[in-house]
């Protein structure tokens, strides 16, 4: 049996662009993609902390070190510049692997610069 497990997460990123006239996707600073283990073109869930909206899209790498988090296409209707979002990728794995799995959780500051990287989440802690 395969389980769907959190693979990587970028926590409380700030939306820097919302481009309605783009084909689709979310553009993410390549440094954040690498740190979180999320790949270009990978399916992600985006959770908007400001309004509770949840959406699925795919990633496009943005310029390394730029801090870009851009919701593109229809997703731009669900996020505004300045909104805080959580970006999550999932992976399918066998139960045996899932029990040992440690996802990458990337915490960023208000400029989307990496503050800390953890391999697990603890209830009640935002960092």
Curated annotation (Swiss-Prot):
GO annotation, cellular component aspect: cytosol
A UniProt-annotated Pfam family: Asp_decarbox
Q: Which domain of life is it from?
A: Bacteria
EC assignment: 4.1.1.11
Question: Mainly localized where?
Answer: cytoplasm
The record's subcellular location field reads:
Cytoplasm
* Note describing how the cofactor binds: Binds 1 pyruvoyl group covalently per subunit.
**Top-level EC class, please?**
lyase
Which residues are substrate-binding?
57, 73-75
What is catalyzed by this enzyme?
L-aspartate + H(+) = beta-alanine + CO2
From the Swiss-Prot or TrEMBL record, give the protein name: Aspartate 1-decarboxylase
Q: Which organism was this protein described from?
A: Carboxydothermus hydrogenoformans (strain ATCC BAA-161 / DSM 6008 / Z-2901)
Origin organism lineage? Bacteria, Bacillati, Bacillota, Clostridia, Thermoanaerobacterales
